[in-house]
Amino acid sequence: MAISHNTLAFTFGMLGNVISFLVFLAPISTFYRIYKKKSTEGFQSLPYLVALFSSMLWLYYALLKKDAFLLITINSFGCVVETIYIILYIIYAPRDARNLTFKLLSAMNVGSFALILIVTNYAVHGPLRVQVLGWVCVSLSVSVFAAPLSIVAQVVRTKSVEFMPFNLSFTLTLSATMWFGYGFFLKDICIXLPNVLGXVLGLLQMLLYAIYRNGGEKAMKKEKKAPIEPPKSIVIETQLEKIEQEKKNKDDDNEEKDKSEEPIGCGV
């Protein structure tokens, strides 16, 4: 007996929900460290703002489409989780990073989303409204999937996969495959199309990982084998050490002085 398209769409959608659920929870360790250290440690808020914006758009699209319940479940969860991440970031970020986050949040997640709401509710009507919103979602998803191309270029240039973990590439490829299947059997090109690009780029990343996974180790071995030049003069080295020690002692004194002048409990 042949399996219906609705059954296959539900199966792929459920698997997509499970995998995307894990992807949304992946930054928990990062934000736990931020919470423990009370510092964002140079992390950027843009990826989480974009993820929230994407979840908001896909949730709105699913509500208008009315037959994409599994898109509603995962993107509702995504909106909640990404909002929590952003709140934690704002609490512990330095002033400049916090101000930039507020500006991006206002421009993208509030301003742009409000503009899309106005256009899709007053400028276009009926089936055209869903189509316009769908292609907006496609454009955003394509730009998000294309973002790791800079990492791909870095891997090819450095022949090292240090900044492209295999597990993440594999998970995102699997997620794109599941959502492509969901869109394909649901006969929704707006869901399926961007995930074709996502899967292709994911496979490319895994291929590069297989090619360059030993690149970093070879570079380290090469550095270890490089001959170490002996010091030209023990006398000169000793004199330099004395100068460095005197400089260090002077810097330590200045540092202690600076610490004593630092205001206690000053808000960032």
From Swiss-Prot:
Residues 243-268 are annotated as: Disordered. Residues 10-96, 131-214 form the MtN3/slv domain. Residues 243-262 have a biased composition (Basic and acidic residues). The chain crosses the membrane at residues 8-28, 43-63, 71-91, 104-124, 132-152, 166-186, 191-211. Induction: During nodulation. Gene3D superfamilies: 1.20.1280.290. It is a multi-pass membrane protein. InterPro entries: SWEET, SWEET_rpt. It comes from the Eukaryota. It holds the Pfam family MtN3_slv. The keyword Transmembrane applies. One of its GO terms (cellular component) is plasma membrane. Keywords: Cell membrane, Coiled coil, Membrane, Repeat, Sugar transport, Transmembrane, Transmembrane helix, Transport. It is found in: Cell membrane. Residues 29-42, 92-103, 153-165, 212-268 are cytoplasmic. Residues 1-7, 64-70, 125-131, 187-190 are extracellular. The keyword Mitochondrion does not apply. Residues 234-262 form a coiled coil. One of its GO terms (molecular function) is sugar transmembrane transporter activity. Forms homooligomers and/or heterooligomers. Belongs to the SWEET sugar transporter family. Mediates both low-affinity uptake and efflux of sugar across the plasma membrane. This is Bidirectional sugar transporter N3.
